[in-house]
Curated annotation (Swiss-Prot):
The lineage of its organism: Archaea, Thermoproteota, Thermoprotei, Sulfolobales, Sulfolobaceae. Belongs to the TDD superfamily. TSR3 family. GO terms for molecular function: 18S rRNA aminocarboxypropyltransferase activity; rRNA binding; S-adenosyl-L-methionine binding. This is 16S rRNA aminocarboxypropyltransferase. InterPro entries: RNaseL-inhib-like_metal-bd_dom (IPR007209), Tsr3-like (IPR022968), Tsr3_C (IPR007177). Changing W66A: Decreased S-adenosyl-L-methionine-binding.
Amino acid sequence: MKVYIIDYHKDDPKRCTGKKLVKLKIAEFTRVGKGVVLDPFAQITLSNKDKDIVRRIGITIVDTSWNNTSQSEFKNIRGEHRRIPILFAGNPIHYGIAYKLSSIEALIATLYIVDEVEEAIKLSNVVKWGHTFIELNKELLEAYKNKTEEDIKKIEREIIEKILEK
């Protein structure tokens, strides 16, 4: 499975998990989107329908800082733009915050959702807090795994409603 990183050089290089993926030869840098482009602003949610594209072409992660990101950074990237459904960060910088995943967490989530669970778990070993991300989101990841976009959006709405009730 191919993993591509578009690096906008806005992240602290010491904490940048996208660069770490490249350094470990799990991913390679690119300037163009290929396959499924993970885009937090996308209208379409990642689902089992994307499994074939992920396996044949790959996954593109845009590595940028959450503090400086905007929709315009994603606008001109070609590929199948997909949004990861609600999950909570396990990384020390954004721990417990919904949607604010690191590049490696986004990749782990993508692999899990398209039913590449073994690969996702193996990848979680790359960072100290990788297993924390999976444990924190285990129930959600299992609920999203191999589901249609409609099913995933329904689960996501239920989660958001529960959060808003509190």
